């Protein structure tokens, strides 16, 4: 179990601080299967999940949708045959907040 999965997302306003470099290094270590990507100057977390078919990929996507609604924090999701690409970032601050790491860990937990 990951300590991040026990945490809840907090409301993230436009003036909320992005994670620092030190926090980034620590938090990334807690979600080793995730990569850090920069798109349009915005740092994001991304992971590709593999499945045996489209139906399983879609079932995972639906579980993730339920989780996102419960936490009121929503990812980018690309569902394809046999895989789901999930991208977390905080839109309001155009970067990474601790919420994104919490949600990445909780997304991983959906596989259990």
From Swiss-Prot:
Which reaction equation describes what this protein catalyses? Answer: (4aS,6R)-4a-hydroxy-L-erythro-5,6,7,8-tetrahydrobiopterin = (6R)-L-erythro-6,7-dihydrobiopterin + H2O
Sorted alphabetically, the keyword list is: Lyase
Q: Which GO terms describe its molecular function?
A: 4-alpha-hydroxytetrahydrobiopterin dehydratase activity
- Name the GO terms of the biological process aspect: tetrahydrobiopterin biosynthetic process
Q: What is its EC number?
A: 4.2.1.96
- Family of the protein in this entry: Belongs to the pterin-4-alpha-carbinolamine dehydratase family.
Q: What is this protein called?
A: Putative pterin-4-alpha-carbinolamine dehydratase
